[in-house]
Amino acid sequence: PINYILLSLGVIIGYFFGVLMAPKLSLSPDSITTQGVVVFLMVFAVLLLDFIIRKNNVTKNNNFVILLFVLFVLLVPQVYNAPKLILANIFVLLATRRILSLTTEKNTIKKIFDATMYITLASFCYGWTILFFVVLYPAIINKTKFNITYVFIPIVGFLGITSIAVAYQFVVTDSY
């Protein structure tokens, strides 16, 4: 418990370094709310990473991975000025959680679709995260009893989520 408090404190300290390095600082209520959400999302990302590690026995009984994550965030505190990047990070962590859970044979199609959905949503926030589809296919081949329909689920999921996003853009902004 104390290590989570210290790591959360590290995230908050990194936030203050990121805000101090920002070229312009506004103290409007909207800006303060946005920055509070950013700090909450970063703490949530740390706790989500810890959950993924503990649930899938990635490391034994230590917190070095989340310590390294917090230290990397402290190395680049400008990440706090990019809320879309933090949101994409959370979506990638959620996709990683679903990919690692493919070892159990329950609801394999749902897990593959969920991972596809999270990667697609992350790519809407930050375009380069679409490359995580490269990780999804070897996981499908190696971690499941291979079925050819599993290969087409990410394609159908990506096209479905993208078509919903495009339809939303047409309705809301009247343009693509």
Which stretches of residues belong to each language-model region?
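N-terminal membrane topogenic signal
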Residues: P1-V11, T59
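Aromatic- and kink-enriched transmembrane "portal" helix at the membrane-lumen/periplasm boundary
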Residues: S31, L68-I86
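Transmembrane-helix motifs of polytopic, lipid-linked glycan transferases
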Residues: F40-N56
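Transmembrane-helix signature of polytopic, membrane-embedded enzymes
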Residues: I53-F72
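Membrane-interface transmembrane helices that cradle and orient dolichyl/undecaprenyl
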Residues: A95-K110
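Membrane-interface alpha helices of multi-pass inner-membrane proteins
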Residues: K111-C125
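Perimembrane helix-loop-helix junctions
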Residues: F132-V156
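Membrane-lumen/periplasm interface segments of specific transmembrane helices
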Residues: I153-Y176
